A protein has these predicted regions:
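A short acidic, often aromatic-flanked loop/helix-cap motif at beta-alpha or helix-coil junctions
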Residues: 87-89
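Short phosphate-engaging motifs
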Residues: 8, 41, 54
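An amphipathic, aromatic/His-enriched active-site/gating alpha helix that lines ligand/cofactor pockets
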Residues: 18-30, 48-82
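Short aromatic/hydrophobic contact patches that present stacked aromatics
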Residues: 1-3, 44-46
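Short, surface-exposed ligand-recognition loops at beta-strand->loop->(often short) alpha-helix junctions
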Residues: 3-13
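Short beta-strand micro-motifs enriched in acidic
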Residues: 35-37
Length: 89
């Protein structure tokens, strides 16, 4: 969940949208969905990975390649990352 600065959601989504094809092609990525809060104050990414290790390797790659720094001017605070286990009921 990325908290955003006022009026920055469209620009954030544009930059993020350009990066998502590489995310979806990254080893271990099964799915990524983007949700934009109606009031423009946040964007939520819901990702499914083969393992937590795959996601951590991907995130480190995004740090090294500069995407994390490129997103920084749009956010109002640190992103919130949560890990969930998919459960079948």
């Amino acid at each position: 969940d990325f908290p955003l600065q006022d009026g920055k959601q469209a620009e954030f989504l544009e930059l993020l949208g350009g990066a998502l094809p590489d995310t979806r092609a990254f080893d271990g990525c099964l799915k990524v969905e983007t949700f934009a809060e109606e009031d423009g104050k946040s964007v939520l990414l819901v990702e499914e990975w083969e393992s937590k290790k795959h996601q951590e390797t991907y995130f480190q790659w995004r740090v090294e390649t500069g995407l994390v720094d490129a997103l920084a001017p749009f956010v109002s605070g640190p992103p919130v990352t949560r890990y969930y286990e998919i459960r079948s009921e």
